[in-house]
């Protein structure tokens, strides 16, 4: 019987590759993908903005009455303004320096709240924040990431605070605020149906990198999670320690100051196998980054008496032949993302760790 070959070259790897996402992974990904939800709800989102033409704050009643998920409404605004994640959290951290804090009292109970003044339809409006600033303002907290965008949430004061900023921020009376939020001008198109549709179409194209990045991240997470589940099913009761984003003792970077992180690490006793995963249907720079790190990682892992394996697949990756070749030359085991190939990886791990 021929000995199983673990360290394939690029041609052998491509012959065994799936190239396109397997159905079971695509189904997992679609349950967490943001893009379809934005496309499906775009017309309803536009309708809400068109109806809110008498008062800028009517939008809150309309969201409530229509049962439109406030986190999905906010996600539309984040994509259209290109102002979410880190920029939004940075605004939250600098909140006190941008918005005047005013004491408000009801029945002698005083609370200090931030105030936002802005122009809309040639009138000046004032909005008093009820929740901002908060300890941390992240996509997960706002339920606008892939994992939680489908969750049912109420229209809280925090949502109202952020929606007002993203809709009218560019119209702030305070020039410093309007400069920070210069892209937050969706509110200026309320009631202007044709202009609003044109703006939204153009902005979705312009910021497609946000949704594209979200999709790539989600797909990558699904692929990594499936590998971990696959390994745990087969090794869970055999004393193997399996970790996502794991480390190997002695494998470092930054002049030895930081342990190197691998997508998956499986360990038994003193031996470990690090696993790096890349499945790209469309070409991007992820595989180039992994290739750039491949030799140094291979050398360090080998020097510590351990092993490194790669799971590489996707039509986009195989367009980067030099990168794939570099990885194949600096790997103890290289497999594609099919059940048959994952079983080859399984045999490699058994051979090296048992």
Curated annotation (Swiss-Prot):
It catalyses: Endonucleolytic cleavage of DNA to give specific double-stranded fragments with terminal 5'-phosphates. It holds the Pfam family RE_BanI. Its EC number is 3.1.21.4. GO terms for biological process: DNA restriction-modification system. It comes from the Bacteria. GO terms for molecular function: type II site-specific deoxyribonuclease activity. The keyword Cell wall biogenesis/degradation does not apply. Keywords: Endonuclease, Hydrolase, Nuclease, Restriction system. It is an enzyme of class 3 (hydrolase). Homodimer. This is Type II restriction enzyme BanI.
């Amino acid at each position: 019987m021929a000995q199983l070959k673990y360290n394939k070259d690029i041609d052998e790897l491509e012959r065994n590759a799936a190239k396109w996402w397997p159905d079971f992974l695509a189904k997992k990904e679609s349950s967490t993908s943001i893009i379809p939800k934005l496309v499906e709800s775009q017309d309803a989102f536009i309708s809400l903005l068109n109806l809110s033409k008498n008062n800028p704050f009517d939008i809150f009643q309309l969201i409530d009455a229509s049962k439109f998920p406030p986190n999905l409404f906010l996600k539309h605004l984040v994509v259209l303004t290109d102002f979410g994640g880190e920029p939004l959290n940075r605004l939250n951290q600098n909140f006190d320096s941008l918005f005047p804090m005013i004491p408000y009292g009801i029945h002698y109970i005083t609370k200090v709240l931030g105030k936002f003044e802005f122009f809309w339809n040639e009138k000046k409006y004032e909005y008093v924040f009820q929740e901002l600033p908060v300890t941390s303002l992240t996509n997960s907290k706002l339920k606008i990431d892939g994992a939680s965008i489908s969750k049912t949430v109420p229209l809280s004061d925090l949502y109202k605070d952020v929606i007002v900023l993203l809709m009218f921020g560019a119209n702030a009376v305070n020039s410093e605020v309007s400069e920070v939020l210069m892209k937050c001008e969706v509110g200026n198109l309320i009631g202007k149906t044709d202009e609003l549709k044109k703006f939204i179409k153009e902005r979705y194209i312009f910021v497609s990198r946000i949704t594209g990045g979200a999709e790539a991240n989600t797909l990558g997470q699904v692929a990594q999670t499936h590998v971990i589940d696959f390994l745990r099913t087969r090794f869970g009761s055999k004393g193997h320690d399996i970790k996502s984003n794991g480390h190997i003792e002695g494998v470092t970077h930054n002049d030895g100051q930081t342990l190197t992180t691998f997508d998956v690490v499986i360990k038994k006793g003193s031996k470990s196998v690090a696993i790096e995963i890349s499945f790209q249907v469309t070409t991007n720079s992820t595989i180039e980054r992994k290739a750039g790190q491949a030799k140094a990682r291979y050398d360090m892992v080998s020097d510590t008496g351990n092993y490194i394996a790669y799971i590489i697949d996707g039509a986009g990756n195989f367009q980067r032949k030099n990168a794939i070749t570099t990885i194949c030359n600096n790997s103890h085991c290289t497999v594609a993302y099919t059940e048959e190939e994952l079983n080859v990886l399984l045999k490699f791990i058994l051979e090296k760790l048992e």
